[in-house]
Amino acid sequence: MNRINQAADATEDTLRLSIDAKATVKIGPFSRGGKSRIQVAAADHDFAPEATVTPVGIFLPTLAELFIYGVTSHVTSDCLVDCLAQWWETVRARFSHITTLVVNLDNGPENHSRRTQFMQRLVDFVRHYRVTVRLAYYPPYHSKYNPIERCWGILENHWNGTLLDSIDAVLAFARTMTWQGRHPVVHLVTATYETGVKLTKDAMQQIETQLQRLPALGKWFVDIMVPV
């Protein structure tokens, strides 16, 4: 993993990013620990939240840039790739020289390399945007080394001791956190995502012909090349 990351960071036409979803935030007057300068009354149980928001983050380690998408639906394979596509639409003019995206991610249930819908959506992404995607997964119990995890710790400390009693409050705290002196770009995602979407075995076999898996480590390192 270190070799792949270092090679990506040293290659002019390659951009490395880290993607992950934070734990879902329950909206309501709930205690979240931490301290506040003012007295805040909070419920000590978080039953029946008014809504939920799951922050999905895309972090550029070499540029210290963070993008957060507040998702109000399920974080599915489709959701993750939609966030990736929305991010790329907003930045690709800046990165017109980039031909490869190296993506650091953990081996979660919605984004592992055997997740059929995730892989199909990434193949579609590569075909549409004409940019190669290299997936570099952290193995089990090592997701804490995924660079974006450090950002989630900062965000958690930033809003601890406060009441996240509305979606707007969650987004406002996300916008005012800082990473190396910079605020993240924050968007709200209100699309509805269905769970359990998957391909048939035959359809996935066709997708596999468009993937290049590293021998002996095919679950952890996958290239999706731009078709000729």
Model-assigned labels for residue ranges:
Residues 1-41:
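Charge-mixed, compositionally biased segments that are often intrinsically disordered regulatory tracts
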Residues 5, 21-25, 60-62, 107-109, ...:
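Short, flexible loop/turn elements at secondary-structure junctions
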Residues 17-18, 100-107, 135-140, 173-174:
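Extended hydrophobic secondary-structure segments that form protein cores and membrane-embedded regions
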Residues 41-104, 109:
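Electropositive, glycine- and tryptophan-enriched low-complexity nucleic-acid-binding patches
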Residues 93, 161-228:
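C-terminal accessory extensions appended to soluble enzyme cores
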Residues 105-118, 139-145:
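Acidic, metal-coordinating catalytic cores used for nucleic-acid/nucleotide bond scission
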Residues 118-136:
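Two-metal-ion acidic nuclease core segments, chiefly of the RNase H-like superfamily
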Residues 135-157:
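RNase H-like two-metal-ion nuclease catalytic core shared by retroviral integrases
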